[in-house]
Amino acid sequence: MKLHDLKPAPGAHRERKRIGRGIGSGKGKTGGKGMMGQKARSGPKPSPSFEGGQMRITRKMPKLRGFKNRWRVEYQVINIGQLNDVPDGTELTIEEMVAQGWIHPAKPVKILGDGELERKLTIHAHKFSASARARIEAAGGAAIETPWVVERRSRSRGPNPPRHSRKAETPQKA
């Protein structure tokens, strides 16, 4: 086989359709653009929301105000009234709450003070409301806050890239 024998695979190369070159070509006169209206002309087309002069739906809708805070932390809540099923004197960790099916491990958990706590429990959570903390301690238990660490992703540096502080970069005066 020589270089001049090489050919593309059948169906791999399609010839360009020459439009606007006579009615016998199948794409003559209007060149596949239909009747000659505004959409058939060259240049910018009307915006997708344009409805022919009728009041468009995008103008009928009220304006969206405000913004969505991308740093908002959404807590899963557990009321202390739900914790009466746990045996007295237990140390309730976040892993045990996940195992019970009360929370999802991907989001932080906050303990709220709705209901009555009749058990002495040591509870680990990311946050406690003031009333929940008071009721847990009144029942003889302890409320221990564990920090919520967000694992940030970076394509180049993997999970949790190091944060650079400006203080570390400034040279110390001698």
Swiss-Prot record:
Signal peptide: none annotated. It comes from the Bacteria. GO terms for cellular component: cytosolic large ribosomal subunit. Residues 1-57, 147-174 are annotated as: Disordered. It holds the Pfam family Ribosomal_L27A. One of its GO terms (biological process) is translation. GO terms for molecular function: rRNA binding; structural constituent of ribosome. Keywords: Ribonucleoprotein, Ribosomal protein, RNA-binding, rRNA-binding. Residues 21-35 have a biased composition (Gly residues). Gene3D superfamilies: 3.100.10.10. Binds to the 23S rRNA. Belongs to the universal ribosomal protein uL15 family. This is Large ribosomal subunit protein uL15.
